[in-house]
């Protein structure tokens, strides 16, 4: 947004409005309470810095074909699909991993055809629970199909309690066709603001 890119965030995991508020908090580096207490201050800033560039929409029950049509019509620069695994796709598949592979192939084609960055959000399988480093072998419900279609895969791991005070996260780049760098990065999350440091 700060660079002037048009961004679309398709939400089918959490309600779209909740995601949008979280993105606004993150953009301004503020808590939900600070946002609510200072709406007159942030409303014009939102209209200037976020509203022209960001659309957050519900994607419950949506297909990748509909995402493709939207991209052709509206020409965004970046699209997030959270979670891409839950998007429908035409065709019949014998196994879930075959359907997922085809979904990710289609997503890659959307990116190429429309010259946009396509960011697919997915979950780790149970293998990733309480793990420091989440690599692409731990992606949920996939053999190699999802990983094969991605240019970069970033896993976010966490160990220890689920308590809000556990702010350490481990970011693991396990595939990188962009510049080849792989490895872990330790970070801290400000849970109240949705910002990593």
Language-model regions: role of each:
Residues 3-75, 89, 184-187:
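Cytosolic-facing regulatory segments adjacent to core modules
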Residues 17, 86-88, 125-128:
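Short, active-site-adjacent cap segments at secondary-structure transitions
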Residues 1-2, 112:
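Anion (oxyanion) recognition and catalysis
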Residues 8-11, 55-56, 80, 120, ...:
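Structured core elements
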Residues 64-79, 106-114, 126-197:
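C-terminal regions of RecA-like/P-loop NTPase motor modules
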Residues 13-14, 83, 116, 120-125, ...:
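A short beta-strand-to-loop transition that corresponds to the Sensor-1 phosphate-sensing loop
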Residues 33-35, 55-57, 88-101, 130-137:
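Flexible beta-alpha connector loops of hexameric P-loop NTPases
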Residues 77-120:
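Helical hairpin unit composed of two closely spaced alpha helices linked by a short loop
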